[in-house]
C-alpha cells in the first residue's frame, strides 16, 4: 500500500479515536457504558495498531505436492464451474483437484462439471470428480478427498468462490516458515454490487481479514482459516481425520464449523497466519433470511470452538487471549446495551442515547478505516453495519448461544445468490 494511503488511514483513525474517547469519557464517565467504551477503544487500538504493522510473506514458495479440495452441495452450476476454472488457472501447479458432490438433490452442477472435465481432457487430467450417494455434510465430502490424496499440502476452496490466479502461490510463501501450519487469504464479496446487504457484508469481510486476521497473524495465531481460501499442511489434516469427521459437542454430532475446527488442529502444531496477497471473491447471501441463517451457524461454531481455544490457555495463551477478548467484548456489549435501555432510557436522557448511537457510528468507521482507501463511498455505509451489528447481529448471537444445542443449525441449505 502506498505510504500516503497508509498515512491517511492512520490519521483518520487517530481523529476518530479522539472523538470516541471524548464522547465516552465526557458523557458516560465510569458508568457501565463508559467502562465498556474504554475496553472497546483499547481493543480497537490494539487490533488496528497490529494490523498497521502487518506485512505479507515474501519469497518464492518451496516445492510441494498440493491437492485442492472443493466440496459442493446443491451449488449453482455456473458458479461451481467458475470455481473449478479459477483453480485450474493457478500459477502454482496442483497435483490433484478434487470436486466432491455431497449427495445434492439438484445434480445440474456436478453434471456440468463432469461434462467439462470429459471435454477438456488436456487441462483436467488431474481433476477427480466424485458423487456421494447421500448427503453427509461438508466434512465428510472433504474427508473423501483427504483420505485418497498423498499431498503435502491441502488447499480448501468453497464451491461458490473465485480464487485469483496467484492465490495458491502467495499462500505457499507463508510455508517457507516451517512453524506455520495453516494460512488463509483475503476474502471479498463477489456479488458486492447486488444490494445494500451485500455491500455491508463486503465491508465486514474486509475488516475481518484486513484488520482482525492481519492483527492475529502478527502474533501467529489467527483464529479462523476461512473455507473459501486456505491451505493446511498434511500433518494438520490426516492425523485428525477421524476426529474431524466425528466431532461431537454436548453429546451431539457436529457438521458445521469445519474452518475453525481445522484451524484449531493447526494451532496445536504451530502458527496460523494470514496472507493478504492471496485473494478470492465469494458469493454472499443477498436476502436477510439467508444471511441470518448463515450468521446463526457461524455464531454457534464460534462459541463451540471458543471453548476449545480457551482450554489452550497454558499451551497457547495468545490464542486463548484473542478468544477471551472476543467473548468478553460480546458479553460486555450486551450488559452495556441493557444498562442503557433500562437506565438511561428510563431517565429520558436523550443526549446520552444520541451519544451512544454516535459512538456506535464512530466505532464502525474506526473498525473499517482500511476500507476508506478501497471504496470511499461504501466506507460511509459503515455506520449502517454498526446499526445492523448492534440491533440485529448481537441479539442473534445471544439467541445462538441460548440455542447452541439445537441441531437444526447444522443443516446448510444452498440458496441462489444471483437472480
From Swiss-Prot:
Residue ranges crossing the lipid bilayer per the database entry: 8-28, 33-53, 318-338, 345-365, 376-396
Reactions the enzyme catalyzes: [hyaluronan](n) + UDP-N-acetyl-alpha-D-glucosamine = N-acetyl-beta-D-glucosaminyl-(1->4)-[hyaluronan](n) + UDP + H(+); N-acetyl-beta-D-glucosaminyl-(1->4)-[hyaluronan](n) + UDP-alpha-D-glucuronate = [hyaluronan](n+1) + UDP + H(+)
Keyword Nucleotide-binding: no
Subcellular location: Cell membrane
GO CC terms: plasma membrane
Pfam assignment, any one: Glycos_transf_2
Protein's GO biological process: extracellular matrix assembly; hyaluronan biosynthetic process
Cofactor(s) annotated in UniProt: Mg(2+)
GO molecular function: hyaluronan synthase activity
EC number(s) reported in the record: 2.4.1.212
The entry's keywords: Capsule biogenesis/degradation, Cell membrane, Glycosyltransferase, Membrane, Transferase, Transmembrane, Transmembrane helix, Virulence
Membrane topology of this protein: Multi-pass membrane protein
Keyword Transferase belongs to the record: yes
Enzymatic class: transferase
Pathway in which this enzyme or protein is active: Glycan biosynthesis; hyaluronan biosynthesis
Protein's job: Glycosaminoglycan synthesis. The hyaluronic acid capsule is involved in the pathogenicity of group A Streptococci; it may be the major virulence determinant.
Assigned protein family: Belongs to the NodC/HAS family.
Protein name according to UniProt: Hyaluronan synthase
Source lineage: Bacteria, Bacillati, Bacillota, Bacilli, Lactobacillales
Amino acid at each position: 500500500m502506498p505510504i500516503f494511503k497508509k498515512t491517511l488511514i492512520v490519521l483518520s483513525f487517530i481523529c476518530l479515536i479522539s472523538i470516541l474517547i471524548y464522547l465516552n469519557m465526557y458523557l458516560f464517565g465510569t458508568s457501565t457504558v463508559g467502562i465498556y467504551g474504554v475496553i472497546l477503544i483499547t481493543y480497537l487500538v490494539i487490533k488496528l495498531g497490529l494490523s498497521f504493522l502487518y506485512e505479507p510473506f515474501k519469497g518464492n514458495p518451496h516445492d510441494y505436492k498440493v491437492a485442492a479440495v472443493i466440496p459442493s452441495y446443491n451449488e449453482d452450476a455456473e458458479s461451481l464451474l467458475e470455481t473449478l476454472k479459477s483453480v485450474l488457472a493457478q500459477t502454482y501447479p496442483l497435483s490433484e483437484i478434487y470436486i466432491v458432490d455431497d449427495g445434492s438433490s439438484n445434480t445440474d452442477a456436478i453434471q456440468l462439471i463432469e461434462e467439462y472435465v470429459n471435454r477438456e481432457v488436456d487441462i483436467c487430467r488431474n481433476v477427480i470428480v466424485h458423487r456421494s450417494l447421500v448427503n453427509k455434510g461438508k466434512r465428510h465430502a472433504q474427508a473423501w478427498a483427504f483420505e485418497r490424496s498423498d499431498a503435502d499440502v491441502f488447499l480448501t476452496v468453497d464451491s461458490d468462490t473465485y480464487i485469483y490466479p496467484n492465490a495458491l502461490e502467495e499462500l505457499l510463501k507463508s510455508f517457507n516458515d516451517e512453524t506455520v501450519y495453516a494460512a488463509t487469504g483475503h476474502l471479498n464479496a463477489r456479488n458486492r454490487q447486488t444490494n445494500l446487504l451485500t455491500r455491508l457484508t463486503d465491508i465486514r469481510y474486509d475488516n475481518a481479514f484486513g484488520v482482525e486476521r492481519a492483527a492475529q497473524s502478527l502474533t501467529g495465531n489467527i483464529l479462523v482459516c476461512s473455507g473459501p481460501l486456505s491451505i493446511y499442511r498434511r500433518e494438520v489434516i490426516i492425523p485428525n481425520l477421524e476426529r474431524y469427521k466425528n466431532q461431537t459437542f454436548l453429546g451431539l454430532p457436529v457438521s458445521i464449523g469445519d474452518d475453525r475446527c481445522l484451524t484449531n488442529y493447526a494451532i496445536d502444531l504451530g502458527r496460523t497466519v494470514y496472507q493478504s496477497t492471496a485473494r478470492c471473491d465469494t458469493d454472499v447471501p443477498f436476502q436477510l433470511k439467508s444471511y441470518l441463517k448463515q450468521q446463526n451457524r457461524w455464531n454457534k461454531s464460534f462459541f463451540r470452538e471458543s471453548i476449545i481455544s480457551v482450554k489452550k490457555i497454558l499451551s497457547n495463551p495468545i490464542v486463548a487471549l484473542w478468544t477471551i477478548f472476543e467473548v468478553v467484548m460480546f458479553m460486555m456489549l450486551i450488559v452495556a446495551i441493557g444498562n442503557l435501555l433500562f437506565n438511561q432510557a428510563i431517565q429520558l436522557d436523550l443526549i446520552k442515547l444520541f451519544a451512544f448511537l454516535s459512538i456506535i457510528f464512530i466505532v464502525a468507521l474506526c473498525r473499517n478505516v482500511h476500507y476508506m482507501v478501497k471504496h470511499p463511498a461504501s466506507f460511509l455505509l459503515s455506520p449502517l453495519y454498526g446499526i445492523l451489528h448492534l440491533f440485529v447481529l448481537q441479539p442473534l448471537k445471544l439467541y445462538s448461544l441460548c440455542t447452541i444445542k439445537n441441531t437444526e443449525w447444522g443443516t446448510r441449505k444452498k440458496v441462489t445468490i444471483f437472480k
